[in-house]
């Protein structure tokens, strides 16, 4: 395997609407991100994954794109975008754009033309049928919407304002590749590809993910755009297995650099149930099994994985699986240490590095997320008690990740001088960047050290992975690289756990506890975590 820059990279996801507001309108923007690049450089990250900033009516927070080659006015201008790319480059930070090509907004010129003129070439850029089948939207209800002008139904797997593309249309594909090259020419560092596993869909056969033409389309995209350039490309692939991940990310296949797989994240939900039926407790045995599978079955020569706990669609890990009260700092560090020393490219979601938590939502009028509001409406119609609905939204709703970044203890956590578009978490006076930077033992410095370890240690790329047999709530593994052996241990519980180290400790790479004491006593305190190199 040829080593690439992204094998040692750590990517930081910015959700622009909630990161930093430069002009007091309550909405984060591009100049706001640029103003915080020194902070991100201090953390040490290699790249920023930028959630969509394209022109959009914002029905789904920018994932409904009206113009791929224009910036949404709420975020700034194309000049602001160029400046962000240039200023990031000065700090050795690359900008990864969020590529949403499964669908557009219904306000995109292509869709407008498709509706106005059924004989236009653009009509075939979307999927139209005389009669709907029973496919359902991910955002609830039918995936088909009736268009009165033409008397046909169009397909939308997300909101009805997000019509799905017809990837079978070659002209559409060429238009998409031209748009990608527009951004590549601007000097971006790659693409994160939203729900990319859906582009090969065959709606008449109810094939939604992993359709037969998915990989041929990605090979074609690779050749037409980023294939000969040193860019990071990552596909959002909810249904991927290690075998499927190889199809995407094996360098010989010439598709993508890596995938986002969500098998571990699905432990947040009850099996076979909608996401709102969340699991009350983390199944640690299953978590170990899933990570062991991905670490051992997706070999370094066969492909590459992403490592993440959080993103803009998920609840805060420290709240759903950690302990965001007594052990907030320690459990946040434990999850970071456990994940970042595996094979793959780690992703940090904004605020994760300071231990931001879920928001204590009490009423529906505090909620902005379209998915949560659709769920609430349908659940209320079915007679589900409001308190039960609010409990689900508090635990699993997407707005938990989208509350404004907590910069300091001033009004609105320093995010904006105006009224924030979504309320700031009331705990911002205790949990904020200023506080984290002032405390040498904060979560921030654990993340900073993990980023540094990855930059400096190539064994993280190639070392074998061996899961250790331990107490149920202890997750421990060995990374073996030639004669060197590194032991990573995390107690994922509020209780003490027995654990004995086989062999002698040569050195401590990182810890959230006094490792020597834990090793000598053969007992892990709640949420203890560390990585040590073992002596020969």
Identify the residue ranges that each predicted region occupies:
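Acidic/aromatic-lined carbohydrate-recognition and catalytic surfaces
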Residues: 2-177, 181, 185, 196-253, ...
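Carbohydrate-interacting/catalytic domains
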Residues: 1-55, 82, 86-88, 345-348, ...
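Active-site regions of oxyanion-processing enzymes, predominantly non-cytosolic
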Residues: 183-193, 305
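Conserved alpha/beta catalytic core and glycan-binding cleft of carbohydrate-active enzymes
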Residues: 106-138, 218, 222-404, 409
């Amino acid at each position: 395997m040829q080593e690439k820059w992204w094998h040692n990279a750590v990517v930081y996801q910015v959700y622009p609407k909630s990161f930093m507001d430069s002009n007091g309108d309550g909405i984060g923007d591009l100049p706001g991100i640029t103003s915080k690049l020194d902070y991100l450089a201090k953390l040490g990250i290699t790249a920023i994954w930028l959630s969509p900033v394209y022109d959009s009516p914002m029905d789904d927070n920018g994932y409904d794109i009206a113009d791929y080659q224009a910036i949404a006015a709420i975020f700034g201008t194309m000049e602001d975008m160029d400046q962000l790319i240039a200023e990031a480059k000065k700090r050795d930070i690359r900008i990864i754009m969020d590529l949403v090509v499964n669908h557009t907004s219904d306000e995109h010129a292509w869709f407008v033309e498709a509706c106005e003129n059924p004989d236009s070439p653009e009509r075939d850029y979307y999927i139209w049928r005389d009669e709907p089948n029973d496919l359902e939207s991910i955002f609830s209800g039918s995936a088909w919407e009736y268009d009165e002008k033409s008397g046909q139904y169009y397909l939308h797997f997300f909101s009805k304002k997000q019509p799905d593309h017809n990837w079978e249309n070659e002209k559409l594909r060429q238009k998409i590749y031209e748009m990608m090259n527009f951004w590549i020419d601007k000097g971006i560092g790659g693409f994160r590809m939203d729900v990319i596993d859906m582009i090969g869909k065959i709606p008449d056969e109810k094939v939604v993910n992993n359709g037969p033409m998915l990989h041929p389309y990605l090979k074609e995209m690779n050749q037409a755009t980023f294939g000969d350039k040193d860019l990071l490309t990552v596909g959002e692939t909810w249904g991927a297995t290690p075998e499927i991940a190889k199809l995407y990310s094996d360098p010989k296949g010439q598709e993508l650099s890596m995938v986002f797989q969500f098998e571990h994240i699905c432990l947040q939900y009850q099996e076979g149930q909608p996401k709102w039926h969340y699991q009350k407790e983390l199944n640690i045995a299953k978590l170990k099994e899933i990570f062991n599978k991905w670490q051992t079955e997706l070999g370094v020569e066969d492909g590459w994985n992403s490592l993440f706990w959080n993103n803009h669609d998920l609840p805060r890990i420290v709240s759903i699986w950690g302990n965001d009260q007594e052990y907030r700092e320690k459990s946040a560090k434990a999850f970071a240490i456990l994940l970042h020393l595996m094979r793959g490219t780690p992703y940090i979601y904004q605020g994760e590095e300071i231990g931001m938590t879920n928001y204590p939502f009490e009423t529906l009028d505090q909620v902005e997320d379209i998915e949560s509001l659709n769920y609430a409406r349908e659940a209320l119609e079915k007679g589900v008690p409001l308190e039960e609905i609010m409990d689900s939204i508090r635990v699993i709703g997407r707005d938990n990740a989208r509350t404004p970044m907590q910069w300091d203890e001033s009004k609105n956590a320093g995010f904006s001088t105006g009224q924030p578009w979504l309320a700031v978490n009331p705990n911002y006076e205790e949990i904020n960047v200023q506080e984290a930077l002032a405390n040498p033992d904060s979560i921030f410095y654990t993340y900073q050290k993990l980023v540094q370890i990855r930059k400096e240690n190539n064994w993280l790329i190639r070392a074998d992975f061996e899961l250790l047999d331990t107490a149920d709530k202890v997750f421990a593994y060995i990374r073996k690289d030639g004669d060197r052996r590194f032991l990573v241990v995390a107690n994922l519980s509020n209780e003490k756990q027995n654990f004995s180290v086989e062999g002698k400790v040569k050195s401590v790479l990182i810890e959230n506890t006094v490792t020597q004491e834990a090793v000598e006593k053969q007992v892990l305190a709640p949420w203890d975590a560390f990585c040590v190199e073992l002596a020969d």
